[in-house]
């Protein structure tokens, strides 16, 4: 008998729930690190959907850890304050004055807003930075521009991770929301690329998955050819493709390669423009975006 139009939505919902069961069992008790950025961080509907996804994971016995950046928000605040901003080699040149703004925006605005959205579902989220409990130790980095090593100020890479700072929050059934600021060995605070920080944290926590939210459908092996979108790729193939990728995708792909090469079972580049993209990727057979696995 053909289901009636009224009965169909209920049947579809039941099918989706049944499809999610094996994935829920697989991920129960596991840590999933999510790099939060792009449109998912600026569109109100997507922000609320993402926050609901985090609460859903927590209530299913999965341990989400959110790492966020805030480039567009930092740029907007610098403009409002009349502070000049410059980029070299794809990185923001970070003077002490720019760093003060970055700290204010990352932890005081972007992180606070996400914590509040998640906590609308219950007392779950706790905002921290890489400065707290020595979560991250940074080492200053430079970039190469036209073959010349170039200083970009207070910009760092993650040198060490104190996983206990986050594991203690997970043990208390909290959702850590991490702003990517970190001191170096001398205590000088640096701004850290959020993609890099997410990969380092996933590795240190022994995460089951690393999810990278982007503003594209996934990884294209020959952009702008839409037919080149791949649903799964191994690290060897992806490493060969890396030099040919669009500049904006390279830090995300490097983060995926780092995490999977360090033992994280899979990393996922997913479309953050899709409502509840995290749930779609984790709990449906088709998923969304591109899965990176070990060779």
UniProtKB/Swiss-Prot annotation:
GO terms for molecular function: acetylglutamate kinase activity; ATP binding. Substrate binds at residues 70-71, 92, 191. GO terms for biological process: arginine biosynthetic process via ornithine; L-arginine biosynthetic process. InterPro entries: AceGlu_kinase-like_sf, AcgluKinase_fam, ArgB, Asp/Glu/Uridylate_kinase, Glu/AcGlu_kinase, NAGK-C. It is an enzyme of class 2 (transferase). Signal peptide: none annotated. It catalyses: N-acetyl-L-glutamate + ATP = N-acetyl-L-glutamyl 5-phosphate + ADP. The keyword Cell membrane does not apply. Its EC number is 2.7.2.8. This is Acetylglutamate kinase. The gene is argB.
